[in-house]
């Protein structure tokens, strides 16, 4: 085991991690201005999942409030494949917005929709179902092109039991990326913590009494995705908080795969910078070194009696004041 060199966790003396294997991709997705350059000052993105119903209840005023806080870009969520509209994952939600209406409200607020999180409802990632996944991404791409997005990102992990499963999923990802690329849109995958679990080859069994000093068997799911997807078709959005929760150093992953991580999710336990556990100076430094296209703030977790809008605004203030954020 090797200890993290550029530690991105500040509590408990850091987390030990098995060093991920470096890749050497010969190709990469061409650079796209994912985060808007139309606004002077810092360019800050927000994943609208952070607000949920608080935004949907009054979109025009809510969007203006985000612009006033300093956000320039949105990464939206809530795409409905049955209607092609956008809403909320909350089953009680009754507000759904057509793409053209969504874009107009965002444009009127001086913001831009530059990315979107969406996932097919089909859960069986098999070779037989590949045409069905293709159809999902073709329809979704047409609708997202109306929004003018630069990126479409899948944020949910299919069921993966072994390396063969990961290879099939990677091929489905490659096909999705090929579809969106024809529309000038980057396709990406967003991690949580489960991607940093190790899986074995099909039929291989874990050791009953492993040597505690030997390297652990198996390969990280995230690493299998990186190795088995085409850099010309698939990029990755690194959620730095969930990487840390998976006992990983996000800086180390960016070092080892500098041409694959194009977007970041900047996240903390709730408000950005409040917990003191995330080493954001190191994270941003490495992100700029590898040339990320942009980042999106996302809030989850304990509200501590405050509204989500308050958390989003306080997070923006932290990033606006941070000297390490460009």
List where the protein language model places each region.
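N-terminal export signals
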Residues: 1-24
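Hydrophobic faces of well-ordered beta-strands that scaffold small-molecule active sites
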Residues: 42-47, 74-76, 113-118, 152-154, ...
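Gly/Pro-rich active-site loop or hairpin
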Residues: 52-55, 63, 93, 232, ...
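Active-site acidic/histidine proton-transfer and metal-coordination neighborhood
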Residues: 7-9, 13, 105-107, 122-235, ...
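Glycine-rich, proline-tolerant flexible connector loops at the mouths of alpha/beta enzymes
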Residues: 76-101
